[in-house]
Amino acid sequence: MTQKNASSASPLSYKDAGVDIDAGDALIERIKPLAKKTMREGVLAGIGGFGALFEVPKRYKEPVLVSGTDGVGTKLKLAFEWNMHDTVGIDLVAMSVNDVLVQGAEPLFFLDYFACGKLDVDTAAAVVGGVAKGCELSGCALIGGETAEMPGMYPPGEYDLAGFCVGAVEKSKILTGVAIKPGDVVMGLASSGVHSNGFSLVRKCIERAGANAPATLDGKPFKQALMEPTRLYVKNVLAALAAHPIKALAHITGGGLLENIPRVLPEGTAAHLTKGSWPQTELFAWLQKTAGIDDFEMNRTFNNGIGMVVVIDASQAAACAATLRAAGEAVYVIGVIAARGDDAAVLVR
């Protein structure tokens, strides 16, 4: 037997191998006008170069850069199944900019990473359109990103997302929580829904409910209620920070209230939350009933209706709440800071 001469075989292009450079170029052209809408003070060079350039605004005297990175988790599985791709980009931005905000920082710029097995330009453009929308709503520039088409790495129709944010805060205004003391008030800002954590359990609940899943939750179609994008707290909370002496913020993500509030509490303090001090939505009531889990597990898995926590001196709480409500936030006084004994750092009772 003779081996076929490789030189006589048909030539192979990169496209034959599964990577379509033309599709990637087409996507970039669709992204550019979306990114342009997010441009802000400080952007020197954005999408198209080898690296994006950003100058820290001159109004900062002692700027400290704050970075954050995150993804959207298994919420993407529902996006694939339900063909709902236009809001997961907002989720991606929110997960990082809300984290950066917790340090007292203003998000400055954002980069996204979109990975897939085969690039569908329409799907990718819908996703990145959501990223641009999230950046625009946060006052954050979409300054660059990466689209990776990797044949064989992802099943057809699926992709993964990651996001990266950099913000800035005056060194003297970094929120550390060190000034928190017993008697301080704990306020909660309402979430828009499940946000981007707990979706492995959400998907199990959908599977368990099957045809018995409700048509609507909280006045929204079932799928829309579950896919509602993570709330962006940036602009409203930055305004409150400028007007009131907020001591700490906590972004309620994976681990819920029970795992995230302790991250900003100084040693020797605890947060005592009052059960029923904020409304339980139909969405979370359905998840709890369908999963058959207790309140403790709900508060450790989901945000359970509270997406951001604010800790402030009792004398300042009413004024701060009024500022946030005037900006459109639903605000609840959900607890108080106490001296910590032998109990957990967060108690809900």
UniProtKB/Swiss-Prot annotation:
Its main location: cytoplasm. InterPro entries: PurM-like_C_dom, PurM-like_C_sf, PurM-like_N, PurM-like_N_sf, PurM_cligase. Pathway: Purine metabolism; IMP biosynthesis via de novo pathway; 5-amino-1-(5-phospho-D-ribosyl)imidazole from N(2)-formyl-N(1)-(5-phospho-D-ribosyl)glycinamide: step 2/2. Its EC number is 6.3.3.1. SUPFAM superfamilies: PurM C-terminal domain-like (SSF56042), PurM N-terminal domain-like (SSF55326). It catalyses: 2-formamido-N(1)-(5-O-phospho-beta-D-ribosyl)acetamidine + ATP = 5-amino-1-(5-phospho-beta-D-ribosyl)imidazole + ADP + phosphate + H(+). GO terms for molecular function: ATP binding; phosphoribosylamine-glycine ligase activity; phosphoribosylformylglycinamidine cyclo-ligase activity. One of its GO terms (biological process) is adenine biosynthetic process. It is an enzyme of class 6 (ligase). PANTHER family: TRIFUNCTIONAL PURINE BIOSYNTHETIC PROTEIN ADENOSINE-3, TRIFUNCTIONAL PURINE BIOSYNTHETIC PROTEIN ADENOSINE-3-RELATED. Belongs to the AIR synthase family. This is Phosphoribosylformylglycinamidine cyclo-ligase. The gene is purM.
